[in-house]
Design a protein with these regions (language model features):
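N-terminal glycine-/serine-/threonine-rich beta1-alpha1-beta2 phosphate-ribose binding loop
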Residues: 1-99
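Short, acidic/turn-prone active-site loops that include or flank metal/cofactor-
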Residues: 68, 106-108
Length: 108
């Protein structure tokens, strides 16, 4: 079996799109890792309210309201919050910390 280096992934936002991205990372992580050529470790999901209902079952231990700390521990940040702020600030923080950023944010 091939061993890949792990990429630590942080997801910002768990609305309709974010929750489904998290679901795919959790359910198809091994397949995605093979395609990416790297292990994928979901380190957390930043949300406004950890107790809000979600469209996917996200383990409570992955949810946090501390996006800044989550970003600092990530190699890849997937921004799916929408809007301009705080998404813009979080993206800039991620880039400044050396993380790669993926976003579907049309406002930015």
């Amino acid at each position: 079996m091939i061993e890949y280096r792990n990429l630590r992934i942080a997801v910002l936002g768990a609305g309709a799109v974010g929750a489904q991205v998290v679901r795919l990372l959790l359910e198809q992580g091994e397949d995605l890792a093979g395609r990416a050529g790297a292990g994928l470790e979901l380190v957390g999901v930043a949300v406004r309210n950890p107790d809000a209902p979600r469209t996917a079952d996200i383990p409570r231990k992955l949810l946090t309201t501390d996006a800044e700390s989550l970003i600092l521990g990530a190699d890849v940040v997937i921004e799916l919050m929408g809007g301009i702020e705080p998404a813009r600030s979080h993206i800039l923080q991620a880039l400044n910390s050396g993380a790669d950023v993926i976003t579907a944010n049309k406002a930015l």
